[in-house]
Amino acid sequence: MNHVGRKCSMSAIVGTTNAGKSTLVNVLVGQKVAAVTPKVQTTRVRMHAVSNHENVQLIFIDTPGIFSPKTKLEKFLVKHAWMSLKGIENVIVLVDVKNYLNQHLKKIIDRIKHSNLNAILVLNKIDIVHQSIVSEVIEYMYSLYKFSKAFTISALYGIGIDKLVDYLCETSPYGPWLYNDDQISDAPLKFFMAEITREKLFITLRHELPYSLSVVTELVEEKEDNSLIIKQVIYVTKDSHKTIILGKKGEMVKKISMESKSDLENILQVKVHLFLFVKVREFWQNHLNECVGYAE
């Protein structure tokens, strides 16, 4: 690989829960690499997503939303979020324009003040508010911290993304690429598979289901016809949650399985045989090996 003239940078995307971090990462990369749901705290672990633009490789670190941790799982997530700020060029502070008066956002800013990182302000969801509100939020955010640059976007509709990418490409330092040309993430395949199913669960069940569930891909087996057998376990903390996921006569879990199967086949370009199992484990949140989406 010829490194001459190449540029590479790493940017961590931080923000409060449900600010749109995973949606932004997927748009920047051009493929689904992180779960996108209406639920808060759906990103379990930090993940590197890769986007190449001619001679520039942009690496984005999708982080768990930073909030006040209580359980062992939540403390694990927040620790990983702050670990993402080590050894990077930029920190992108993603702000939901309808939820900018947030105490956790102030805590994030206070932490960044002591990091000496190039902090970029990105206001998301501008498609749902008036321009006057956007200006008000920018003014407020700059009263908290002097950001190097500010951008306004709608990650959902792709508004303003090009300007953000152009800036990141322009300011990236010269250096070799860290990932191959065709690589879009450093997450294991089993993790990707679990993320797809977890997204379908949250989107389908929305307010009926808490975020305290985990999907673990326990088996991926290739058949002679090149199709894949995928077995996943959905861990929940209560019998009532299991009942919700299964649905009447198993119709709900069948629906989720079909939707996840469809996405997996589109992404992997192979036929998929997906088997979902729902298990109750009251304190699964204290078993960190089951929080990352895959089993070795």
UniProtKB/Swiss-Prot annotation:
Residues 205-282 form the KH type-2 domain. Residues 153-155 are annotated as: G5. GTP binds at residues 15-22, 62-66, 124-127. GO terms for biological process: ribosomal small subunit assembly. It is found in: Cytoplasm; Cell inner membrane. Keywords: Cell inner membrane, Cell membrane, Cytoplasm, GTP-binding, Membrane, Nucleotide-binding, Ribosome biogenesis, RNA-binding, rRNA-binding. Residues 7-174 form the Era-type G domain. An essential GTPase that binds both GDP and GTP, with rapid nucleotide exchange. Plays a role in 16S rRNA processing and 30S ribosomal subunit biogenesis and possibly also in cell cycle regulation and energy metabolism. Belongs to the TRAFAC class TrmE-Era-EngA-EngB-Septin-like GTPase superfamily. Era GTPase family. PANTHER family: GTPASE ERA (PTHR42698), GTPASE ERA, MITOCHONDRIAL (PTHR42698:SF1). This is GTPase Era. It comes from Ehrlichia ruminantium (strain Gardel).
